[in-house]
Amino acid sequence: MPRFDVYRNSGEYAEVTPYLLDVQSDLLHGLDTRVVVPLRRRDSFPVVGLPANLTPTFEVEGVECLMETPKLAAVPLRLLKSPIASIASKQFEITAALDFLFHGF
């Protein structure tokens, strides 16, 4: 499962958070979980003062989505079906958001 692949969210909140972004290192392929960050529809995100570098936006299937970095979680592999997109080209922004969450810079 390549890092930065995007999967459909089959969970309860899929209408407002339609996608999950895989942010786990490819070197950890033996685990039965993957660390993901929810990608929430930008138009359903409340207006709050979160730093833009913590919650960058990306377009997936024509939908503008906000990376909800503070809500990252591990999910079982069985919940992640076939990837629908890759946003590996946004690696810098994604990694910067994760660094900001964990290190504050």
PLM features per residue range, with description:
Residues 3-6, 10, 14-56:
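Compact nucleic-acid interaction/catalytic patches
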Residues 1-3, 95:
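Secondary-structure boundary/capping motif
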Residues 58-105:
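C-terminal terminal-subdomain/extension
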